[in-house]
Swiss-Prot record:
<dbReference type="GO" id="GO:0061463">
    <property type="term" value="F:O-acetyl-ADP-ribose deacetylase activity"/>
</dbReference>
<feature type="domain" description="Macro">
    <location>
        <begin position="1"/>
        <end position="175"/>
    </location>
</feature>
<dbReference type="InterPro" id="IPR024900">
    <property type="entry name" value="O-Ac-ADP-ribose_deAcase"/>
</dbReference>
<dbReference type="Pfam" id="PF01661">
    <property type="entry name" value="Macro"/>
</dbReference>
<comment type="similarity">
    <text>Belongs to the MacroD-type family. YmdB subfamily.</text>
</comment>
<dbReference type="GO" id="GO:0008428">
    <property type="term" value="F:ribonuclease inhibitor activity"/>
</dbReference>
<feature type="binding site">
    <location>
        <begin position="122"/>
        <end position="126"/>
    </location>
    <ligand>
        <name>substrate</name>
    </ligand>
</feature>
<keyword id="KW-0378">Hydrolase</keyword>
<dbReference type="GO" id="GO:0042278">
    <property type="term" value="P:purine nucleoside metabolic process"/>
</dbReference>
<feature type="active site" description="Proton acceptor">
    <location>
        <position position="35"/>
    </location>
</feature>
<protein>
    <recommendedName>
        <fullName>O-acetyl-ADP-ribose deacetylase</fullName>
        <ecNumber>3.1.1.106</ecNumber>
    </recommendedName>
</protein>
<feature type="binding site">
    <location>
        <position position="25"/>
    </location>
    <ligand>
        <name>substrate</name>
    </ligand>
</feature>
<feature type="binding site">
    <location>
        <begin position="33"/>
        <end position="35"/>
    </location>
    <ligand>
        <name>substrate</name>
    </ligand>
</feature>
<dbReference type="InterPro" id="IPR043472">
    <property type="entry name" value="Macro_dom-like"/>
</dbReference>
<dbReference type="InterPro" id="IPR002589">
    <property type="entry name" value="Macro_dom"/>
</dbReference>
<feature type="binding site">
    <location>
        <begin position="11"/>
        <end position="12"/>
    </location>
    <ligand>
        <name>substrate</name>
    </ligand>
</feature>
<comment type="function">
    <text>Deacetylates O-acetyl-ADP ribose to yield ADP-ribose and free acetate. Down-regulates ribonuclease 3 (RNase III) activity. Acts by interacting directly with the region of the ribonuclease that is required for dimerization/activation.</text>
</comment>
Amino acid sequence: MTSRLQVIQGDITQLSVDAIVNAANASLMGGGGVDGAIHRAAGPALLDACKLIRQQQGECQTGHAVITPAGKLSAKAVIHTVGPVWRGGEHQEAELLEEAYRNCLLLAEANHFRSIAFPAISTGVYGYPRAQAAEVAVRTVSDFITRYALPEQVYFVCYDEETARLYARLLTQQGDDPA
């Protein structure tokens, strides 16, 4: 049986999956890093969908997740989540990051998505240490998929080789084959 968890090094905007996760900011209006890359690749329809969500419910709070159509992306949808800003680890950062991953997975499950791709949430300008963030991500996703049938496939999409090796090592340590 192949693992439901896989590590990919590359550009998350190029994946043909049911849902791509966007490491968004609270405004949902795009920004730097993966957030900006997803908005640019998806085109103006994504920004319009995000504006509509803001009009309906305001900003997206840390740990929460919302879903939009994917615009020009190959994915069916984009799930936007706001990860925590790293403030030394004493301000519930791990719990909030766990909540962000779990809420994305719950949206994927509720929408009957078979596949989802995650970036390394909060590790860019939000400053979350990569190794600690990866541990939270792998633990949270692994726990979720033992309880739910969907999504069937979860991808950790890493921009660089070092981060990809980190995720692969964590998956191997827990008995998964990340390839």
